[in-house]
Amino acid sequence: MFPLKKSLLLLFFLGTINFSFCEEERNAEEERRDDPEERDVAMEKRVLPLVGNLLNDLLGK
């Protein structure tokens, strides 16, 4: 019975370490996706057309 418990404990420990590495990698990928420059470019793409349309409407062109 003791060798079985020891094996299960070892598997649990290794699985926990593996899960921790996967979580760190996932967090690193999310940080890369949330790059501030990319967010600024996305914001410009959304805001500039709206501002352009608003100016066109105000100026009557």
From Swiss-Prot:
Keyword Hydrolase assigned: no
Record's signal peptide: 1-22
Record GO cellular component, one term: extracellular region
Biological processes, Gene Ontology terms: defense response to Gram-negative bacterium; defense response to Gram-positive bacterium
Tissue and organ distribution: Expressed by the skin glands.
Subcellular location(s) per record: Secreted
Keyword match Lyase: no
Name of one Pfam family that matches: FSAP_sig_propep
Propeptide section residues: 23-44
Modified residues (Leucine amide): 59
Keyword terms: Amidation, Amphibian defense peptide, Antibiotic, Antimicrobial, Cleavage on pair of basic residues, Secreted, Signal
Family statement: Belongs to the frog skin active peptide (FSAP) family. Temporin subfamily.
Function field: Antimicrobial peptide.
Protein name in UniProt: Temporin-CDYa
Native organism taxonomy: Eukaryota, Metazoa, Chordata, Craniata, Vertebrata
